[in-house]
């Protein structure tokens, strides 16, 4: 369970009640990484640990993926608080 949601790694479905959402591999990696650590992670940490990019690389990959994942979750589950951000860090509380 992740904040009241279930994640099936085999089917890649993220669900709560009767609602289910198909996730990509990267979306699953983001959720598992943010949930496992229980701390705020800045963009550089996510770039390095999920994408393997160096911290000094200029990219908006993390922000774009997190934005799209938040939107998918918000659109289906009406949950705008699943992935939180604070001072350039992302976390699941």
Task: Give the residues covered by each predicted segment.
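A structural micro-motif at secondary-structure boundaries
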Residues: 2-28, 32, 91-93
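Signature for phosphate-centric chemistry
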Residues: 69
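A short linear beta-strand->loop->alpha-helix hinge motif most characteristic
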Residues: 79-93
């Amino acid at each position: 369970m992740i904040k009241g949601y279930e994640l099936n790694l085999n089917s890649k479905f993220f669900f709560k009640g009767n609602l289910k959402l198909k996730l990509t591999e990267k979306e699953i990696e983001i959720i598992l990484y943010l949930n496992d650590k229980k701390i705020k992670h800045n963009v550089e940490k996510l770039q390095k640990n999920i994408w393997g990019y160096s911290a000094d690389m200029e990219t908006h990959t993390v922000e774009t993926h997190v934005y799209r994942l938040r939107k998918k979750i918000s659109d289906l589950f009406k949950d705008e608080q699943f992935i939180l951000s604070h001072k350039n860090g992302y976390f699941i509380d």
